[in-house]
């Protein structure tokens, strides 16, 4: 029997990321797990309006999304616990300016530089609509075709209902394989 859990947001886990922003020569970092794909070249970064980083993103119209692995988790969690309005977080991560002009964390295994094209505001959140301009990955986390290999990347995942971090799991199978097998078994009647 299923139980009604009320209006619980249960689309988790999500990748843990650190958003980088720069405004007036100052870099700030913020742990953000509410990042989602909304098109083949677009993503949305959803940040509570109380965050100091939001105004920096609004000013520059650019941000970086840095994937978090276990080696950087303590510092990534830290930049989500303290406000950039009160704490200078610029030196928490060694970083460089990426080709798109955003601060990129050196040790992040994969980072995306983004141009902010829109902001969909709700009562409490800025939802930045972003166009990915550059994706930068360490060579040791890519496959032989140069695409990200998440078994090598091992991104940290965030689970909101349990308020915890998770490790990524094993590959179950290639996408579309189960559906094609099912179609063959049912003679494609569905």
Where do the PLM segments sit?
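Basic, polyanion-binding surface patches
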Residues: 1-190
């Amino acid at each position: 029997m299923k139980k009604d859990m009320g209006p619980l947001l249960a689309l988790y886990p999500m990748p843990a990321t650190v958003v980088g922003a720069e405004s007036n020569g100052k870099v700030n970092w913020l742990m953000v797990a509410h990042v989602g794909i909304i098109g083949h070249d677009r993503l949305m970064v959803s940040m509570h309006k109380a965050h100091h980083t939001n105004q920096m993103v609004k000013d520059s119209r650019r941000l970086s999304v840095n994937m978090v692995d276990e080696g950087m988790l303590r510092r990534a969690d830290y930049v989500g616990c303290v406000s950039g309005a009160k704490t200078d977080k610029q030196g928490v991560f060694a970083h460089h300016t990426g080709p798109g002009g955003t601060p990129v964390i050196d040790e992040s295994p994969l980072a995306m530089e983004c141009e902010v094209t829109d902001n969909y505001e709700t009562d409490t959140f800025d939802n930045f609509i972003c166009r990915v301009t550059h994706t930068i990955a360490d060579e040791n986390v890519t496959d032989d075709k140069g695409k990200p290999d998440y078994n090598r990347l091992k991104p940290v995942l965030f689970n909101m209902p349990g308020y915890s971090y998770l490790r990524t799991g094993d590959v179950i199978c290639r996408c579309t394989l189960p559906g094609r097998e099912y179609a063959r078994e049912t003679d494609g009647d569905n």
